[in-house]
């Protein structure tokens, strides 16, 4: 099972559209995961129309229209792994322990908010993934997103994709 992970698209404030390399990944993914801060409903409509399956949440910059359509936290069993998606996890210091306590029973937690890519494993095995932002690099050298796979109940092939400058 192929996964495409993104967050913090902030359209149209940070870019006019999603980057072409990211959009090219959408039809190849079995599941597209978006960890919030869409800002406009057009991006949600676009990904709902192009994705085989969309697992998504709203973020702190999303208005009432997006909050009405998306949960604060989403859960799914994907290929034998229990996934959670949330926008904000708090400060980097102590994140692993805090998330492991808040989300017991998960194998993978996808989050956003910081626009800073993150890939760590908490004590007890919870994998924490932040794909960064494909449209707003915020103190990072590149805009980013992640791809990954689930194979025989294992998360594999986690790759951070760095987008060329706009």
What are these regions (language model features)?
Residues 10-14, 38-43, 61-67, 90-96, ...:
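Active-site environment of divalent metal-dependent phosphoester hydrolases
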Residues 13-24, 85-103:
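Pre-active-site segment of Zn-dependent metallo-hydrolases
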Residues 1-52, 62-71, 80, 141-143:
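N-terminal active-site segment of His-dependent metallophosphoesterases
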Residues 51-94, 105:
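Helix-adjacent hinge/juxtasegments
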Residues 73-74, 117, 146:
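Residue-level detector of beta-strand structural context in well-folded domains
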Residues 47-51, 100-104, 122-123:
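Short, conserved loop/helix-junction motifs that constitute active-site signature segments
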Residues 5-7, 31-37, 54-60, 85-87, ...:
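Active-site neighborhood of phospho(di)ester-bond hydrolases with catalytic His/Asp-centered motifs
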Residues 6, 78-79, 101-105, 129-166:
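Binuclear metal-dependent phosphoesterase catalytic core
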